[in-house]
From Swiss-Prot:
Assembly and binders: Monomer.
Stored InterPro entries: aa-tRNA-synth_I_CS, Arg-tRNA-ligase, Arg-tRNA-synth_N, Arg-tRNA-synth_N_sf, ArgRS_core, DALR_anticod-bd, Rossmann-like_a/b/a_fold, tRNAsynth_Ia_anticodon-bd
Source species: Legionella pneumophila subsp. pneumophila (strain Philadelphia 1 / ATCC 33152 / DSM 7513)
Protein name: Arginine--tRNA ligase
Enzyme class per UniProt: ligase
């Protein structure tokens, strides 16, 4: 069944064709027909500014064009009347019978209502979170997790074949820093008088990993502290450079422990932290189809293949012993190093190989979701994709601003390396999964987010997730009252008497639930799940207003059954929308 908005768009398109065929309008017009929901019921159900858009190319007054369009719009049984307003807006009033058909559709389709075929089964890969496995996820990662998972659900509902992927950065320098941090805590457990590096990972989890290795493997990896720091450059507190110092201590650890010994700490730390990340995300309702290892790119030769592909296309050159990618040829601000003079590949080389791999797996569209601090990566990734011969328009990079927590009006401080950060797990335990999932996606991803912990825990209409869930619970309560009072709900009778739904609150609710498929399609097309969050709050507001104004379980059986059909339709839409957001729909509160 086509949505009412789709019906109006079709009617306007036919009107345009009619005017073009009669010579009253140019044939070569490239106009996008936009139909919006009317903001005021007095102005109908839907409106379009098509006449205003046509005014310039047609060199005619908008109101004149509106009159011509309305005169040739085909008759449709769904439309009661069409009016011209203001400078040339065209307002559509739908028949109550057309609006009521949506109730029947919702009751028939249930959980499938709202699903469409915008994506036409196109294969989409969404990579998100991808936090370094060097510690627990923090609240900033939580926003990316909620956004990515919800976007995946929205795209699935719109007919895309979606794969969710976490890129595990298990081959980089940060993992080496974690491994050496664990080893130093291990030495501390052995009684060595270590001085922990300024750039090491200081969280409690580092102690716990070290304790586990000590308990399982004993003192076989112990070396005297003096042998660890002998002839090393100074650390930051002693006036040195912390980056230089941590690299030096990593090299010393690799030398003292040997390849297998250092790998023992590396792998133990990786497995422990990654398992914790997986458990955390699972508990948050975020489930990945694929955990892609960066290390696998080295093991299967993908790094070399990606670099060779750029070489073969003439997009590289050597300078000062390093291999460079001609990124400026593709719009980047500067060229990028692929292989350093010491023979080590860069993070960028891994990114090139990873995106080569993504396209090689046959995805029609690739979506990268990065934290806002990765804004510098966007251009370089797109230039690499273009240089490799792939369609850069099939790559979307979405930047998600980190969340800032507030408690009691004061900002909560967090810092990853210092170990004092607020974890996603702590946030979930304080406000619950539902509040976290909703609050994280309630704004555009590029907008800064102030997460009010007190608001998220409040049981009031100011808390949007509580307000929406309470609307669902209220409807369930009405259905329970029905049984308690021994009243009857005959769905067939209700569907036959939907014309009795004459109250303005009822017309508003019917218009709102009819919009749900359009909201899903729009959110999918623009990659903006917040549209659904806004919509559900609007629908909940309509329900609460209806509940407070109307006697729902009235004595008149035909009207009561019709109202219950409407209520069940609203409940189903709330349920469907909340499921996409990853939020529960409680039956009582």
């Amino acid at each position: 069944m086509r949505s009412m908005k789709a019906i109006i768009e079709y009617l306007l398109k036919q009107a345009l064709i009619n005017l073009q065929q009669s010579g009253e309008m140019p044939i070569d017009l490239e106009i996008e027909i936009k139909v919006e929901n009317a903001k005021d019921p007095a102005h109908g159900d839907y409106a379009t500014n098509l006449a205003l858009v046509l005014a310039k190319p047609c060199r005619q007054a908008p109101k004149v064009l509106a009159e011509r369009l309305v005169a040739v719009i085909p008759v449709d049984p769904s439309v009661e009347k069409i009016e011209i307003a203001g400078a040339g807006f065209i307002n559509f009033f739908m028949r109550s019978t057309a609006r009521s058909l949506i109730i029947s559709e919702i009751l028939n389709k249930g959980k499938e209502f709202g699903r469409g075929n915008l994506g036409q089964s196109q294969k989409v890969l969404i990579e998100f979170v991808s936090a370094n496995p060097t510690g627990p996820l923090h609240v900033g990662h939580g926003r990316g997790a909620a956004f990515g998972a919800t976007l995946g659900n929205v795209l699935k509902a719109a007919g895309y074949d979606v794969t969710l992927e976490y890129y595990v950065n298990d081959a980089g320098r940060q993992m080496n820093i974690l491994a050496v941090s664990v080893w130093l805590r291990y030495l501390e457990l052995a009684g060595e008088p270590i001085v922990f590096p300024a750039n090491g990972y200081k969280g409690q989890y580092v102690y716990e990993i070290a304790q586990e290795i000590w308990s399982e493997q004993g003192n076989q990896f112990v070396h005297p502290w003096i042998s660890v720091v002998e002839n090393l450059p100074a650390d930051e507190p002693e006036g040195g450079d912390k980056e230089t110092y941590i690299d030096a201590i990593i090299a010393r650890a690799q030398s003292l422990l040997g390849k297998d010994g250092f790998a023992n700490f590396h792998q133990h730390a990786l497995k422990t932290v990654l398992d914790d990340i997986k458990d955390d995300l699972q508990a948050f309702g975020v489930r990945f189809d694929s955990w892609f290892s960066e290390q696998s790119l080295f093991e299967d030769g993908s790094i070399e293949k990606g670099i060779q592909a750029l070489k073969d296309r003439g997009h590289t050159y050597e300078r000062e012993g390093a291999l460079w990618f001609r990124a400026t040829d593709f719009g980047d601000e500067k060229d990028r190093v692929l292989v350093r003079a010491n023979g080590q590949t860069t993070y960028f080389a891994s990114d090139v190989a990873y995106h080569w791999n993504k396209y090689d797996r046959g995805f029609d569209r690739v979506i990268d979701i990065f934290g806002a601090d990765h804004h510098g990566y966007v251009t370089r990734i797109k230039t690499a994709v273009k240089a490799l011969g792939h369609d850069e328009s099939a790559l979307d990079v979405i930047l998600v601003q980190f969340a800032i927590l507030y408690r009691g009006g004061d900002r909560v401080q967090m810092s990853t390396r210092s170990g004092s950060f607020v974890t996603l797990r702590e946030l979930r335990e304080e406000v619950g999964n539902d509040a976290a999932r909703y609050f994280y996606v309630a704004r555009k991803p590029e907008q800064h987010m102030d997460f009010d912990l007190d608001l998220a825990k409040s049981e009031s209409s100011d808390n949007p997730v509580y307000y929406i869930q309470y609307a669902h619970a209220r409807i369930c309560s009405v259905l329970r009252q029905l049984k308690e009072r021994g009243l009857k709900w005959d769905k067939d009778m209700g569907l036959k008497n939907l014309d009795l739904l004459e109250q303005q609150h009822e017309a508003t609710l019917i218009s709102l639930i009819a919009r749900y498929p359009e909201v899903i399609q729009s959110a999918a097309a623009s990659c903006e799940p917040h549209q659904l969050a806004y919509y559900l709050r609007e629908l909940a507001n309509g329900l609460h207003s209806y509940y407070n104004a109307i006697q729902l379980l009235c004595e008149q059986e035909q009207l009561r059954c019709a109202r219950l059909c409407l209520l069940e339709s609203v409940r189903q839409v709330l349920n469907n929308g909340l499921a996409i957001l990853g939020v529960s729909a409680p039956e009582s509160m």
